[in-house]
Regions:
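Protein kinase glycine-rich loop
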Residues: 6-12, 17
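Short beta-strand micro-motifs within the conserved protein kinase catalytic domain, predominantly
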Residues: 64-79
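Activation segment signature within eukaryotic-like protein kinase domains
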Residues: 109-110
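Terminal C-lobe "cap" of eukaryotic-type protein kinase domains
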Residues: 248-272
Length: 349
């Protein structure tokens, strides 16, 4: 290999992320990278990410991909994707470790993410899984970080999303139209961005639920009612108006990334800010609330705490033939959920 694998810095549902150091004399790669690896037999999602990143090309607000390679380690053939190293971890790591961001930082990061989404949508792709865990902090110089969009494993060309309906992404970031089985369009990415802004500003999950709250009832409320994530009271009026534009229930009326870039809340802001770093290695589970201690039951090595799994694959096209009510029921377990811990939620892939 042209690089040497270092320590593990994260684990996801389908892959493990490690540090990677270029071998001496290798000038195609930067000295330090992140390598995302999984078994060749389980590499469909990771291959999709590589293909999408290759099609996207170079964008300052998208995590850079340096290519892919195969390796044989421990008697197992691995598929590896070499990526830009995010020295600051994810925005989910920051919120977990330090709480809410000040509004000036929320503005800057929101603008950076919007630039990335505007580019992605302009090229004709939809990310399908925008959330704090997938928004990464990369060094831009010695003292500041910039936010970049990562994890394109669920991303699709917009027209292909329309051809195959079904659930994609994380339930509690899903727009109402996605819960009813409609296509995950660029507008759904904007709804998810709004959820991310709420979490950055409040330091709490976008849907703040008490222990004992019925998950089925909440998801039906998102789908069929007029509910949207609660706007943090500490946000300025501009910030509240920005979120209103993100949370318009009609996807045809919801503002686009291009429109939001001109909103007073983010217009004219810088995209890099000083930030503390967490000393802990992050994980990248695919749970609805992104708690790092949760590992999906779809992970290569499921945890003993995994108590149940879905009856069927939620990405299956068969969902287009089921009713909206049945689709939403598939997002929850038969057990009464405990909203205070992540084990009450399951990943949607």
């Amino acid at each position: 290999m042209t690089w040497v694998r270092g320590g593990t810095i994260g684990r996801g549902s389908f892959a493990t992320v490690s540090l990677a150091v270029s071998r001496a004399g290798e000038d195609r790669f930067p000295p330090l990278m992140a390598v995302k690896s999984c078994g060749v037999e389980d590499s469909a999602t990771l291959r999709n990410e590589t293909q999408v990143l290759s099609r996207l090309g170079d964008c300052q607000e998208v995590l850079r991909c340096y290519g892919d390679e195969y390796s044989c380690e421990g008697g197992r053939e691995l598929y590896n994707v070499l990526l830009e190293y995010a020295a600051g971890g994810s925005l989910a790591d920051y919120v977990r470790d330090f709480g809410a961001l000040v509004e000036s930082d929320v503005k800057r990061y929101a603008r950076s993410i919007l630039r990335g989404l505007d580019y992605i949508h302009g090229v004709g792709f939809v990310h399908c899984d925008v959330k704090l865990q997938n928004l990464l902090l990369c060094s831009s110089n010695d003292s500041v970080f910039c936010a970049k969009i990562g994890d394109f494993g669920l991303a699709k060309k917009a027209e292909k999303v329309a051809e195959k309906k079904g659930f994609r992404g994380t339930p509690m970031y899903m727009a109402p139209e996605c819960l009813s089985g409609e296509e995950h369009s660029a507008a759904a990415d904007i709804w998810a961005l709004g959820c991310a802004v709420v979490e950055m500003a409040s330091g709490k999950p976008a849907w703040q639920c008490q222990p004992g709250t019925d998950a089925n009832a909440l998801l039906f409320r998102i789908w069929g009612g007029k509910a949207s994530p609660e706007t943090p009271s500490e946000l300025s009026e501009e910030g509240k108006d920005f979120l209103e534009k993100c949370f318009l229930r009609d996807p045809r009326k919801r503002w686009t990334a291009e429109m939001l870039l001109d909103h007073p809340f983010v217009a004219g802001t810088d995209v890099t800010v000083p930030l503390k770093q967490s000393d802990e290695a992050s994980t990248s589970p695919r749970s609805p609330f992104d708690f790092p201690e949760w590992a999906s039951d779809h992970a290569p090595s499921p945890t003993p705490d995994s108590e149940a799994c879905f009856d069927r694959d939620l990405n299956s096209s068969s969902h287009s033939r089921t009713s909206p009510a049945d689709r939403i029921r598939q997002l929850v377990t038969d057990q009464t959920p405990n909203w205070s811990v992540s084990e009450s939620w399951f990943a949607v892939r």
